[in-house]
């Protein structure tokens, strides 16, 4: 992986360039972090005005699933680093970019390929690394799903092989619920492939995300892994709605969680932030998934850490020193649009939200309001997690996403 000896000046021949393939809200915060370090940021997405477009040095609109379009953009931009901001970027073109040394793919082309879907990463984690996980099978038809569920036993969980966050997941208590689970998985699949994963249901106590950060250790000159404090989170219908840090874990469970995170991040290689999702039951920890990029639950680090996950990702990509110090307990709560709105939108209640003690609001600037779409996040700190969660939830609740109300004489 390329390690720059110096950082040039953006928009000049000396510039150090990064290309984001995908321009989400996570990419937006990463772009800001990179720009603070003097990096020239290019952001590409399928629609104009995506969150990272609004802050990048240059914005590009193209089909980020089109291999030829990506190749052409890479030729035009000439980036030093290509950072996929989505699991749906074609693996073949990323491998081509890395193999031909056109640019460094973050963290690696292998990591992006294996984590494109649950089948690739779960098989790798189980067969190659021997990580503890629930029993699982894959199915391409409803009949295969029925046989797999029978082998694993009920209750079980059915998931699309490829979906966004937890979309399309179903708890299946018996055979009579399989058809609905199959249909839900196909409906929310990120591809047209009719393939699902069915896994043993573990009555876990809680879920955590471990952010594992891989960069160069200045003491040794070699790549090493650092860990942020564990992040707890809650989902609603598969979507992240709140997170908090630090999540309470026993010492044994935390040691195991960090060991699992280190093993998967090291095996996938490269530099950057890995978001490792784990189930915890007592002191037992089970691998669930890994994201070779920024993690939505990690938005809480905007308030809790000396350097947020975005700062850490930027530093790690460049091979710079890492500091994962926690400075305060904190929590985040998602600001969602409950209903679809056509046309321009605005955010009411910002004054009330920011009057909540130790709280900040981040609005993503998305151009369209869709039902249940994540439009921003409230981040709060406090002396303890319970208080921080209350503050974040209160602040998020004050924000109303609504059609723009023009004042008389306004434009």
From Swiss-Prot:
<feature type="binding site">
    <location>
        <position position="277"/>
    </location>
    <ligand>
        <name>Mg(2+)</name>
    </ligand>
</feature>
<keyword id="KW-0460">Magnesium</keyword>
<keyword id="KW-0067">ATP-binding</keyword>
<feature type="binding site">
    <location>
        <begin position="199"/>
        <end position="202"/>
    </location>
    <ligand>
        <name>ATP</name>
    </ligand>
</feature>
<dbReference type="GO" id="GO:0004644">
    <property type="term" value="F:phosphoribosylglycinamide formyltransferase activity"/>
</dbReference>
<feature type="binding site">
    <location>
        <begin position="164"/>
        <end position="169"/>
    </location>
    <ligand>
        <name>ATP</name>
    </ligand>
</feature>
<feature type="binding site">
    <location>
        <position position="296"/>
    </location>
    <ligand>
        <name>N(1)-(5-phospho-beta-D-ribosyl)glycinamide</name>
    </ligand>
</feature>
<keyword id="KW-0547">Nucleotide-binding</keyword>
<feature type="binding site">
    <location>
        <position position="118"/>
    </location>
    <ligand>
        <name>ATP</name>
    </ligand>
</feature>
<dbReference type="InterPro" id="IPR011054">
    <property type="entry name" value="Rudment_hybrid_motif"/>
</dbReference>
<protein>
    <recommendedName>
        <fullName>Formate-dependent phosphoribosylglycinamide formyltransferase</fullName>
        <ecNumber>6.3.1.21</ecNumber>
    </recommendedName>
</protein>
<dbReference type="InterPro" id="IPR005862">
    <property type="entry name" value="PurT"/>
</dbReference>
<dbReference type="InterPro" id="IPR054350">
    <property type="entry name" value="PurT/PurK_preATP-grasp"/>
</dbReference>
<feature type="binding site">
    <location>
        <position position="289"/>
    </location>
    <ligand>
        <name>Mg(2+)</name>
    </ligand>
</feature>
<feature type="domain" description="ATP-grasp">
    <location>
        <begin position="123"/>
        <end position="318"/>
    </location>
</feature>
<feature type="binding site">
    <location>
        <begin position="373"/>
        <end position="374"/>
    </location>
    <ligand>
        <name>N(1)-(5-phospho-beta-D-ribosyl)glycinamide</name>
    </ligand>
</feature>
<comment type="function">
    <text>Involved in the de novo purine biosynthesis. Catalyzes the transfer of formate to 5-phospho-ribosyl-glycinamide (GAR), producing 5-phospho-ribosyl-N-formylglycinamide (FGAR). Formate is provided by PurU via hydrolysis of 10-formyl-tetrahydrofolate.</text>
</comment>
<feature type="binding site">
    <location>
        <position position="207"/>
    </location>
    <ligand>
        <name>ATP</name>
    </ligand>
</feature>
<dbReference type="InterPro" id="IPR048740">
    <property type="entry name" value="PurT_C"/>
</dbReference>
<keyword id="KW-0479">Metal-binding</keyword>
<dbReference type="GO" id="GO:0043815">
    <property type="term" value="F:phosphoribosylglycinamide formyltransferase 2 activity"/>
</dbReference>
<dbReference type="InterPro" id="IPR013815">
    <property type="entry name" value="ATP_grasp_subdomain_1"/>
</dbReference>
<dbReference type="Pfam" id="PF22660">
    <property type="entry name" value="RS_preATP-grasp-like"/>
</dbReference>
<comment type="similarity">
    <text>Belongs to the PurK/PurT family.</text>
</comment>
<dbReference type="InterPro" id="IPR016185">
    <property type="entry name" value="PreATP-grasp_dom_sf"/>
</dbReference>
<dbReference type="GO" id="GO:0000287">
    <property type="term" value="F:magnesium ion binding"/>
</dbReference>
<keyword id="KW-0436">Ligase</keyword>
<dbReference type="InterPro" id="IPR003135">
    <property type="entry name" value="ATP-grasp_carboxylate-amine"/>
</dbReference>
<comment type="subunit">
    <text>Homodimer.</text>
</comment>
<feature type="binding site">
    <location>
        <position position="159"/>
    </location>
    <ligand>
        <name>ATP</name>
    </ligand>
</feature>
<dbReference type="GO" id="GO:0005524">
    <property type="term" value="F:ATP binding"/>
</dbReference>
<dbReference type="GO" id="GO:0005829">
    <property type="term" value="C:cytosol"/>
</dbReference>
<feature type="binding site">
    <location>
        <position position="366"/>
    </location>
    <ligand>
        <name>N(1)-(5-phospho-beta-D-ribosyl)glycinamide</name>
    </ligand>
</feature>
<dbReference type="InterPro" id="IPR011761">
    <property type="entry name" value="ATP-grasp"/>
</dbReference>
<feature type="binding site">
    <location>
        <begin position="25"/>
        <end position="26"/>
    </location>
    <ligand>
        <name>N(1)-(5-phospho-beta-D-ribosyl)glycinamide</name>
    </ligand>
</feature>
<comment type="pathway">
    <text>Purine metabolism; IMP biosynthesis via de novo pathway; N(2)-formyl-N(1)-(5-phospho-D-ribosyl)glycinamide from N(1)-(5-phospho-D-ribosyl)glycinamide (formate route): step 1/1.</text>
</comment>
<dbReference type="GO" id="GO:0006189">
    <property type="term" value="P:'de novo' IMP biosynthetic process"/>
</dbReference>
<dbReference type="Pfam" id="PF21244">
    <property type="entry name" value="PurT_C"/>
</dbReference>
<keyword id="KW-0658">Purine biosynthesis</keyword>
<dbReference type="Pfam" id="PF02222">
    <property type="entry name" value="ATP-grasp"/>
</dbReference>
């Amino acid at each position: 992986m390329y390690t720059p000896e110096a950082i040039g000046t953006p928009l000049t021949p000396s510039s150090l360039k990064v290309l984001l393939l995908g321009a989400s809200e996570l990419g937006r915060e990463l772009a800001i972090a990179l720009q603070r370090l003097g990096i020239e940021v290019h952001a590409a997405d399928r629609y104009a005005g995506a969150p990272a477009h609004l802050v990048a040095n240059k914005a590009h609109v193209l089909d980020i699933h089109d291999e030829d379009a990506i190749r052409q953009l890479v030729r035009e931009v000439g980036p030093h680093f290509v950072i996929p901001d989505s699991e749906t970027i074609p693996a073949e073109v990323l491998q081509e970019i890395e193999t031909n040394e056109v640019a460094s793919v973050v963290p690696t082309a292998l990591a992006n390929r294996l984590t494109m879907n649950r089948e690739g990463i779960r098989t790798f984690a189980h067969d190659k690394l021997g990580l503890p996980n629930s029993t699982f099978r894959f199915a391409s038809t409803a009949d295969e799903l029925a046989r797999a569920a029978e082998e694993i036993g009920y209750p079980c969980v059915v998931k699309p092989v490829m979906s966004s966050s937890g979309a399309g997941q179903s708890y299946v208590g018996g055979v009579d619920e399989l058809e609905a689970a199959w249909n839900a998985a196909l409906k929310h699949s990120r591809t047209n492939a009719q393939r699902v994963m069915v896994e043993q249901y573990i009555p876990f106590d809680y879920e955590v995300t471990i952010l594992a950060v891989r960069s160069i250790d200045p003491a040794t000159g070699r790549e090493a892994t650092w860990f942020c404090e564990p992040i707890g989170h809650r989902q609603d219908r598969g979507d992240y709605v709140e997170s908090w840090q630090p999540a309470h874990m026993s010492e044994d469970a935390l040691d195991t969680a960090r060991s699992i995170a280190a093993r998967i991040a090291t095996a996938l290689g490269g530099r950057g932030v890995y978001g490792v999702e784990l189930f915890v039951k007592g002191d037992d920890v089970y691998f669930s998934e890994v994201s070779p990029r920024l993690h939505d639950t990690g938005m809480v680090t905007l308030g809790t850490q000396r350097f947020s996950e975005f700062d850490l990702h930027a530093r790690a990509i460049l091979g710079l020193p890492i500091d994962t110090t926690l400075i305060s307990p904190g929590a985040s709560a998602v600001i969602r649009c409950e209903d679809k709105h056509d046309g321009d939108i605005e955010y009411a209640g910002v004054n009330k939200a920011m009057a909540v003690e130790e709280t900040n609001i981040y609005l993503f600037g998305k151009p369209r309001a869709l039902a249940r779409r994540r439009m921003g996040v409230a981040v709060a700190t406090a002396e303890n997690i319970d208080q921080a969660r209350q503050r974040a939830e209160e602040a998020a609740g004050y924000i109303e996403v609504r059609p723009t109300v023009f004042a008389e004489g306004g434009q």
